[in-house]
From Swiss-Prot:
Stated name of the protein: mRNA export factor ICP27 homolog
ZnF segments: CHC2-type: 130-273
Keywords: Host cytoplasm, Host nucleus, Metal-binding, Transcription, Transcription regulation, Virion, Virion tegument, Zinc, Zinc-finger
Positions with a binding annotation for Zn(2+): C130, H266, C268, C273
Source organism per UniProt: Elephantid herpesvirus 1 (isolate Asian elephant/Berlin/Kiba/1998)
Biological role stated in the UniProt entry: Immediate early (EI) protein that plays many roles during productive infection including regulation of viral gene expression and nuclear export of intronless viral RNAs.
Acidic residues compositional bias, start-end: 617-628, 646-659
Length: 659
């Protein structure tokens, strides 16, 4: 052992499992991984880490190398990269101090190049041309900055984009005020040559990279691979390659101190420089996305579950090992540990994505609670942590609700069909019923039709028989921006009717009231009735005669409806009424069942799968603009007319006819 070094004592404490920590699916708390400086400098702690790499197979070693490479490339901030660089430099410094042969294929040695470039990239978020100018004008012509780029260039050769040449027409960077020497081997420079703290940080990483490169058998220094060297002439000890003793100048924990020194010593009046320094030292609190395009797979749910389940602690602040599929017992830690940043008096958040600057609420708001509010308006469905982007399965609740009647009506759409229970009375849910069915009353609608109430969400239709419902979170756009206007101003002004039963609503629809009627509201088909009466020619003529009679009975009202196409008479036939039953007085139940056979014809035509447009008849005696025949396209969703017709049911008594 060389003079001037402290004696090494055996380490008897717990040794971390490198395979578990690098491959398990959870974010370990840094407070549990901190090793005191006395342990690193005075014991052989690193020897136990090195021994674990020596006992791994080739496949296991490749898995650990890939896991660490992905962790470096996906590091969220400068501090995370600096901690990785600190760990790597401490590891190789202890290897040199303990005189242990280097394994050039372990995860630390195999990821040196990626770590060096990642460190430079994170530092370069700040305006390094201004921070390293040393009074040079313009700041972009900083010679120290050009020297830093050459150190981090990889193979030590001169890069054309880093200096102006006489042959080039466009120079990406201005020429430096001082001549920057070319770097064939970084170990040829004295450590005092690197004046700026950022240069010293990159120098440590680049020196280790050159040493590992030669240990692997590369003839030329750097990343240029040459022929293999005779194993007898190749050594695996760092002391045989570090002639300048740069690694001996490294002190455990000095990387963070050098970066702090570089930022604290700089002072300027450039607003862009201050802004870039702020972002370079910050930890991202979000994904940097303004909107998320729709995807055909579950990538949105998987990404949201990744951030909210793996990166967020529990509500009490302690780390929850149950979030990890591979985490073991005894690895949890209390929330009393805090990780400090290089800046004085500033505490890093307990996890990478905490939000301590959110001023929308009084106090600190976690990342998991930013998009899902805990208020009564946006209350979660259960005590489990539900992602705000997860769409709840509303069909599950509708499917489990008891049907009031065994009679069912079948709806046929474009290539899909669904069933819905039909009740003889569709009165609104009372207070007790609303409490029993919070899924329909609290967060969505006041009826069983699945229509979303205003202000709580919006309905996107259905997919595979299951309606899609997206609950509105505090950061989403209000539904008034996306959802169309439910009712027109004319319908609001003319809605003065009280809530009626389905029977009276169907009767009033035949008497010229302000109600709609469509094919989907027709009674179900009874197979016991005579089907031979329906033919294409006779049915079409009967529909035309009935339409003429209805038009003649309403001659007192000025006609304002547009002309109908040829298929209009067949489509405008109402299943519940005839020309003789269109009186303005209150209609009775007889008006609904007087023409059962004619209704069956219309129902049979609908059930044959004809996808012709649905004609909805709108009649209003008080408003001429509403008295017209509006043509609407076929509703291919599974919700049928019960969703589109009863969305305003319960407000001023205006609702569509539903059975």
């Amino acid at each position: 052992m060389e003079s001037g070094r402290r004696p090494i004592v055996p380490y008897t404490g717990p040794v971390p499992d490198v395979k578990k920590l690098l491959t398990e699916n959870r974010f370990a708390r840094l407070a549990d991984l901190v090793v005191p400086l006395e342990v690193l400098g005075e014991t052989d702690f690193v020897r136990h880490i090195h021994a674990q790499f020596e006992n791994l197979s080739r496949d296991e070693m490749d898995e650990l190398v890939l896991a660490r490479t992905v962790a470096i490339n996906s590091a969220p901030s400068l501090f995370s990269i600096l901690l990785m660089a600190e760990e790597t430099c401490s590891y190789f410094s202890a290897i040199d101090r303990l005189d242990i042969p280097v394994n050039p294929y372990d995860p630390y040695a195999s990821t040196l190049s990626a770590l060096k470039h990642a460190t430079f990239s994170k530092l370069n978020v700040a305006k390094l041309s201004c921070m390293m100018s040393n009074g040079e004008r313009p700041p972009s012509a900083s010679s120290d900055y050009d020297f830093l780029k050459k150190i981090a260039s990889g193979n030590g050769a001169t890069v054309k984009s880093f200096s102006r040449s006489s042959e080039s027409t466009v120079a990406p960077f201005p020429a430096a005020t001082k001549q920057v020497p070319d770097i064939s081997d970084i170990r040829e420079f004295d450590f005092e040559t690197f004046r700026h703290p950022f240069q010293k940080v990159i120098c440590f990483l680049a020196t280790i990279e050159k040493v590992i490169s030669e240990i692997k058998g590369h003839r030329a220094p750097g990343c240029i691979a040459g022929g293999p060297i005779n194993p007898k002439d190749r050594s695996r000890y760092i002391r045989d390659y570090d002639k300048q003793g740069i690694m001996r100048r490294y002190k455990d924990g000095c990387i963070i101190g050098l970066v702090k020194q570089g930022f604290c010593e700089h002072a300027c009046n450039d607003n862009a420089c201050r802004r870039r320094c702020k972002f370079a030292l910050s930890v991202p609190y979000n994904l940097g996305m303004v909107f998320c395009p729709p995807t055909e797979n579950s990538s949105v749910e998987d990404m949201d579950a990744y951030f909210e389940r793996n990166r967020c602690p529990t509500r009490n602040g302690s780390f929850d090992d149950s979030r990890s599929a591979t985490s073991g017992d005894g690895s949890s830690c209390s929330s009393a540990h805090k990780v400090t940043t290089p800046t004085d008096g500033v505490m890093m958040p307990e996890f990478p994505f905490s939000d301590q600057t959110d001023t929308s609420n009084n106090g600190t708001v976690r990342f998991s609670e930013r998009r899902v509010s805990s208020s009564s308006k946006h209350r979660r469905r259960s005590n489990k942590h539900i992602s705000p982007l997860d769409r709840p399965n509303d069909y599950h609740y509708q499917k489990n609700q008891p049907t009031p009647s065994d009679e069912k009506r079948y709806y046929h759409g474009s290539g899909s069909s669904s069933t819905e229970a039909v009740s003889t009375a569709s009165a609104p849910l009372t207070g007790s019923a609303a409490n029993q069915h919070p899924q329909h009353c609290g967060g969505q609608s006041g009826s069983d039709t699945g229509v979303i109430s205003r202000g709580e969400g919006r309905h996107h239709g259905s997919h595979n028989g299951i309606p899609d419902f997206v609950s509105r979170s505090p950061v989403t756009t209000p539904p008034e921006v996306f959802s169309p206007e439910r009712r027109s101003s004319e319908e609001r002004s003319s809605s003065d009717q009280r809530r009626k039963s389905p029977l009276s609503r169907s009767a009033s629809a035949t008497s010229g009231g302000s109600k709609r009627r469509s094919f989907v509201d027709s009674p179900p088909r009874h197979e016991s009735e005579d089907e031979d009466e329906d033919s294409d020619s006779s049915s079409s003529e009967a529909q035309k005669d009935r339409f003429k009679k209805r038009s003649g009975s309403r001659s007192n009202t000025p006609p304002s409806s547009p002309s109908k196409p040829d298929s209009a008479p067949a489509a405008s036939a109402s299943p519940g009424g005839d020309g003789g039953n269109d009186s303005d007085d209150g209609a009775t139940e007889k008006g609904v069942t007087s023409n059962a056979k004619e209704s069956v014809r219309v129902s049979e035509r609908f059930e044959t799968g004809d996808k012709s447009p649905t004609f909805i008849e709108t009649e209003d005696e008080s408003d001429d603009e509403d008295d017209q025949m509006s043509i609407t396209s076929y509703d291919h969703s599974e919700s049928s007319s019960a969703e589109s017709g009863s969305e305003t049911d319960g407000e001023d008594g205006e609702s569509d006819m539903t059975l």
